[in-house]
A protein has these predicted regions:
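Nucleic-acid-interacting cores, centered on viral/eukaryotic replication and modification enzymes
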Residues: 1-231
Length: 231
């Protein structure tokens, strides 16, 4: 009941009024996604994301170290990932820009350094390419939405193996963004063999390995370690 909304301007039945069920007049929300006029949905998303993110990032900074990175990777990034997968990019652009800016400020505080130029590229580069994997959500919003939309068009009535095959045939978000990140990798390593070797090593032995398993660490991540990665 706590996650339900009453889709009517008429008050809910008396037996349901003990719960917080405000009548929904301008748009509806189903499984976390808003449905309604574009301008209304855009404002709903801004109200939910933009007004709450500063507090969430602030708590992340208070925790710091390993715990803060875990929250960024396991909680805040997935939250935006859900939004961009379920809403058209035209509706999420402002939320994405705000989130990306807050993310950079948070990481700069962790690393105690300005993240720009090549450091920002490494920050945005996925861990499979040796980067930190803290991607700009605006870079992937279009691809995430298209992959989710195509997947949703596979009918759940499709029998057994045919359903699995149809889902497997859907081009994934990772596949859709691969060309973009391959281009970013080339930009970061152009005429710089040392940079290329560093990222290849990071993809196999460095940040890629431990960032995916940072929750398994038995000690906090220090500011110096984060700073070293960004440099």
């Amino acid at each position: 009941m706590d996650k339900c909304e009453w889709f009517s301007a008429v008050p809910p039945p008396a037996g349901m009024q003990c719960k917080h069920l405000d009548p929904t007049r301008d748009c509806i929300r189903i499984l976390g996604g808003f449905l309604g006029p574009d301008d209304v949905v855009r404002e709903k998303l801004k109200a939910e994301i933009v007004t709450t993110l500063p507090s969430n990032f602030g708590k992340t900074l208070e925790m710091g170290g390993q715990e803060g990175l875990c929250i960024l990777r396991k909680s805040l990034l997935p939250r935006l990932s859900f939004v961009i997968r379920t809403h058209h990019p035209a509706l999420t652009s402002e939320c994405c820009e705000f989130f990306d800016a807050e993310l950079v400020k948070c990481l700069e505080t962790f690393a105690q350094t300005c993240i720009d130029g090549k450091k920002d590229g490494i920050r945005r580069l996925p861990t499979r390419h040796g980067g930190l994997g803290f991607v700009d959500v605006r870079d992937v919003a279009k691809h995430a939405y298209e992959a989710s939309l195509e997947s949703s068009r596979v009918s759940i009535a499709t029998p057994g193996d045919a359903f699995l095959e149809a889902q497997a045939a859907v081009k994934s978000q990772q596949a859709r963004t691969e060309a973009f990140y391959a281009s970013l990798l080339r930009q970061l390593t152009a005429d710089d063999e040392d940079a290329y070797n560093l990222l290849v090593d990071a993809a196999t032995n460095g940040c890629s390995a431990w960032l995916h398993r940072c929750s398994d660490w038995d000690r906090p991540l220090t500011h110096d370690e984060v700073s070293a990665m960004l440099r």
